[in-house]
């Protein structure tokens, strides 16, 4: 049955084709004409600029004072080594930064598999080449990896640090986004007699630290949260009325189920009487890790989901919970 001419079509089919563990194609149809490019471009920009991830931010190499130099017995110069280190695909669980070490001697390639780290760190591309040793030499370095979002150039971080930064500590341009490549294509779609519709095909490749399907879901959630502000706009022709400012951000009043956490994480929170997002953000990492069956992986998931909404753990909320929530409990 055909609906009103003023109604918009809503996508009825979402097909996910997993090309390989790091690449997926997502097809969404049907869309009104023009909406393919509107949604495709918005999701593409969010995936490239707003997804949280981990990246190398600092490096110290024994015997090296600055990046515009070379090291005896190493085929690559220091700038090339730093560029190769930026290609490390790393995840950190339960904390925001980690220090890795690399020491190797001999002749041949030095890869990510030669890096020493603790159990909270996982390197997804151990075959990634960092440099090549020649003439039976050695190399030692310390690598700092941090969690973040977007792109942070080394020059921006250098301006915020003290002037007495140790010589030899090399800052690295940090690209935290786990999305390596994203492209979209808009094709023709048809519903009954209508042939002027759009089909959106998103082709995405990640660095292996996040599932492509999960990345698209998170980017769509970020977009929806940002558009909520426009949904709440009032007609400017209405007379001004003094309204009491909400005591809390509306997102804090939502149930934790709206975060779409895994079943394990959601059940752990409910067992601790954490029913609303406002309840959750007031907990600290230490408090959550004391929750039975909630481990570091679940904690990382919770932090990432909160970060995508501009929230974090350890927030202080005065007069929480509001009376409306107390009445509902």
UniProtKB/Swiss-Prot annotation:
Belongs to the RNA polymerase alpha chain family. CDD domains: RNAP_alpha_NTD. One of its GO terms (cellular component) is DNA-directed RNA polymerase complex. HAMAP family: RNApol_bact_RpoA. Homodimer. The RNAP catalytic core consists of 2 alpha, 1 beta, 1 beta' and 1 omega subunit. When a sigma factor is associated with the core the holoenzyme is formed, which can initiate transcription. The keyword Zinc does not apply. It catalyses: RNA(n) + a ribonucleoside 5'-triphosphate = RNA(n+1) + diphosphate. The keyword Transferase applies. DNA-dependent RNA polymerase catalyzes the transcription of DNA into RNA using the four ribonucleoside triphosphates as substrates. GO terms for molecular function: DNA binding; DNA-directed RNA polymerase activity; protein dimerization activity. Residues 1-234 are annotated as: Alpha N-terminal domain (alpha-NTD). This is DNA-directed RNA polymerase subunit alpha. Its EC number is 2.7.7.6. The N-terminal domain is essential for RNAP assembly and basal transcription, whereas the C-terminal domain is involved in interaction with transcriptional regulators and with upstream promoter elements.
